[in-house]
Amino acid sequence: YARAIKETFGTDFNVLFGPAYKGIPLTVAATMSISEMYDADIRYCSNRKEVKDHGDKGILLGSPIKDGDKVVIIEDVTTAGTSIEETLPIIKAQGDVDVLGLVVSVDRMERGKGTKSALKEISEKYGFKTTAIVTMADVVEHLYNKPYKGKVIIDDTLKAAIDAYYEQYGAEE
């Protein structure tokens, strides 16, 4: 994540935001890595699915988001953009902030609501950058007809099924 974030956004931001639940450990780990690898002072913030009224109260974990912050969102995958639609109002409710974009680990390369990929639709709808560390095409290429511990993970039969799936549901770009 740290390298993908740096390559896409530099270090000209100050908050990484990870939507609950998977985004919480991703955000903490990425923030630590960016700090260590690039000597950048980046804070992290995540939301909870439900507000707590004890301990660390509220809907947010980590550093508060405040006016003037520049935020990058990180997630594991994005399929239809639903999580972003839920996340942006939470971030924007914290103050006058600039959401710079979204980094995901895997671009599933599936259509969003139209024929474009969900990541492309998100980028166009919200006017910010989106990037993925790897695509499903990268994963398939890496595993196709290559043995792992004596077994081929993606053989010709599975590759044909994957190709058929993407023919029907894959983004057209």
Task: Kindly give the residue locations of the regions a language model identified.
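Short, glycine/charge-rich flexible loops or terminal/linker lids adjacent to PRPP-binding catalytic cores
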Residues: V28-V71, T82-E85
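Nucleotide/phosphate-binding catalytic cleft detector across ATP-hydrolyzing
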Residues: F9, M32, E173
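Short, well-ordered alpha-helices that flank and scaffold nucleotide-derived cofactor binding pockets
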Residues: R3, M32-E36, P89, A93
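Short glycine-rich phosphate-binding loop at a beta-alpha junction
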Residues: T11-K22
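Structural detector of well-ordered beta-strand residues that form the stable sheet scaffold
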Residues: L16-F17, C45, L100, T131
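PRPP-dependent phosphoribosyltransferase catalytic core
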Residues: A93-E173
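Active-site-facing substrate-recognition patch
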Residues: Y1-G10
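A contiguous pocket-lining binding segment that forms or flanks enzyme active sites
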Residues: L60-R111
